[in-house]
Structure formats: C-alpha cells, structure tokens
Amino acid sequence: MGVSALLAALDEDLSEVEQAVALLAAAGVDDPESLSVGEGDRRLLELCRAVTRAGVEVVALCPACGELSEAVVSPEAVAPASPRMTPLGKGGGLREPTYRDLRELPAGPDEGTHELLARCVVGSPSRAAQPSDLELVDDSLAGPIVIACTACSEPIAVDVDVQRAVLERLAHRAQEIDHEVHLLASTYHWSLAEIDSLGDERRRTLAWLVAETR
C-alpha cells in the first residue's frame, strides 16, 4: 500500500486510539485491536519511520544551561514489547490493556478506570484491582524519558507520548502529500489517478522539483 493510501486511514473525527487502530489495520496488521498498547506503540514507531524516514524527535530545554537539546526516539532505542501481568493476591491478576480494552470506556475518569480494570482482570483474584496496579502492567511508550543535553551533558527528563507524537507527525505528512498533489495537478494538469500512479517517491521528487522552480 502506498503512503498516501495508508495515511487516508487518518480521521480527525476519531479518537487517538481509533486512529492508531485504523492506521495499523491499513498497514496490514491482522486484528490490531488485540494488540497490547505497548506492542501497538512500537509498531506505530516503526510505521512512522517507514513513512517519514525518521523516528519521533524530542526537543527539550536544559534546566542546567538553558540550551535546547534534541533526540530521536527510534524503534532500536526502545526495549521490545513484553507481555505484562501483575498478581492480585491468589487466583488471578491484571494484564496489560489492549486497544480493544480502551474502546468505548465510560466518559468519567473514575468510571473509565474502573471499567478498564474490570476488562483486564484475569482469573479470580483474591483482591480487587486498584488504579495503581495499571502502572505495574504499563508497557506503553508514554511517560518520561531521559536525554543528555548536547551542550553540557546534564540529563533532561522529557515527557513523551509516542502514540500522540506519531499521529501528529503522520497527519503533518498527509498535509505535505496534499501539497505535493496540488503542485503537480496545478502544474501539469494531471488527474488524481495519474498522480497516484506515480508512486510515493516519484511524486515527492517531482513536487520538490516544481517547488524549486517557482
């Protein structure tokens, strides 16, 4: 599937979880709703690099020296996904949520958390699951990471949400493709079908050449 067709799966009317599932399905992932959020985040990171040729860029201000530093979160920079479950006393435990577990949760934060816990309980545990137990099974790529300041080497803690960052980057790439299509259509009077037939690399190159001559 071409990049433009893949990015057509993005729909701003959908929630972030629904967009992530739609993208993974368009990329050929079988039953993406069954993926854990941690596995899904890592696949989204790989998808982002395949589409944009880059990982997720992180920029932060160093509190020690005041300089801006940047780093790239790439598939190789994160640990592989690992199934997680924490025991809840005897007889059962709590597993990591899947995308399916996150769909159509109650709107209220307390009610939503309670329902999510209920969906992720395995077996018949001797104690009830608590909201804090979710942290023990969280393998998602959301939360603080530490990068080194490029100026003074001091560590900088940066909050990163890979799912959100990937969706924003891919939405930006979709806008770039729309611009490429517009340039080629207005310059050569080609139809959308003709432009689509060029393929992603050729469309991108021709659009760049047109932009350079303007």
Listing of model-derived features with the role each one plays in the protein:
Residues M1-R214:
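Long C-terminal interaction/binding lobes of large macromolecular proteins
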